Regions:
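Conserved NTP-donor binding/palm subdomain of two-metal-ion nucleotidyltransferases/polymerases, i.e.
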Residues: 1-61, 67-323
Length: 323
């Protein structure tokens, strides 16, 4: 594969980065194998070995992977920290932090290695992970040869892109290429899983975003969903934001803070997650505010209650006005 005159100047740099990431992943697999741990590639590194395997033109900054258990994750972290890695946050291996975050981030100590996110479940977002039923467990069970099943992979990637407001074009491209590779039966299975695992809004938003970016042929797939009144309102809300969010803008900062809420399918789940936001567990509170000592929670609990209560009301008003 050689660059052509029509390809952007960054093409060779992207390919070099891609090859470095692939080489790093093979090294990590070898390290994991020496301690009897199986890892499952996620996101970019997974796609580089599947739909982008021939072109290698998908930018990847770091490596996301999944361990099948918390114990395997701890063992792999210990192994990699003996080599060229260190924990991004020293508290991330505490039981309460693992329960809240569901992943551990490792930073590279050398320029020839890339940063790593080691998941213990596929979906780690604090609200999504609690509202998708048994998806995480079922998706792991359906893995074949340490790879996620295709429709599970699409839903996983869609929720990640939705969480980040579809702000990067590469995520939409990933979803489109995966959809193009699906048979009609797989598309039907995808719709069934979206209903089963409460991924309806995520799926609707992803397909709607693809349609708005020129993939009009997917309108038929969108029409396969019998939209409720609240789902139509949700799509209007999502469609009202077409610019990249800028966290320096107060409104954008507010929307991004609560964006995940809008994608939760069931009203009772949204209310349950709101209660958790108002009254977080010690692990979640520690993760949000990077609390270093247990005593500091006495200050952060009332602070969180005031801030979360005020901003959630503002978000609710904004959602109503925008939809």
């Amino acid at each position: 594969m050689t660059p052509t005159e029509n390809q952007p100047p960054s093409y060779e740099a992207n390919i070099a980065r891609t090859l470095l990431v692939l080489d790093n992943f093979e090294w990590i697999k070898q390290q994991a194998a020496t301690i009897g741990v199986h890892i499952i590639p996620l996101k970019g590194i997974d796609l580089l070995q599947s739909i982008y395997a021939e072109r290698l033109d998908r930018p990847v900054r770091d490596i996301d992977m999944l361990c099948r258990s918390e114990e395997d994750c701890r063992r792999l972290v210990e192994r990699l920290c003996q080599e060229d890695y260190r924990l991004a946050f020293q508290f991330s291996l505490r039981p309460e932090a693992m329960a809240a975050k569901h992943k551990v981030t490792l930073l590279s100590c050398t320029p020839n290695k890339v940063n790593i996110d080691i998941h213990i479940v596929p979906v780690t977002k604090k609200f999504f992970s609690q509202t998708i039923g048994s998806f995480n467990e079922d998706a792991i069970q359906r893995c074949v040869e340490d790879r996620m099943e295709a429709t599970d992979r699409w839903l996983f990637l869609a929720q990640h892109a939705a969480f980040h407001a579809f702000s990067d074009g590469k995520w939409l491209r990933d979803l489109q290429l995966l959809l193009d590779s699906f048979t009609q039966e797989q598309r039907s299975v995808l719709c069934e899983k979206a209903n089963t695992y409460n991924f309806r809004r995520v799926t609707l938003a992803a397909i709607s975003s693809l349609v708005s970016h020129g993939e009009a042929r997917l309108q038929q797939l969108l029409s396969a969903f019998d939209l409720s009144r609240s789902e139509k309102r949700f799509l209007r809300f999502m469609g009202s934001f077409r610019h990249p969010f800028d966290r320096r803008r107060p409104l954008d900062r507010l929307i991004t803070s609560y964006w995940e809420f809008a994608f939760i399918d069931r009203r009772r789940d949204r209310f349950r997650m709101w209660l958790q936001l108002m009254f977080p567990s010690p692990g979640v509170l520690t993760n949000i505010y990077r609390i270093r000592t247990p005593l500091a929670r006495l200050f952060y609990y009332p602070l969180n209650f005031i801030v979360s209560g005020f901003t959630s009301v503002l978000f609710g008003i904004t959602y109503f006005l925008k939809s």
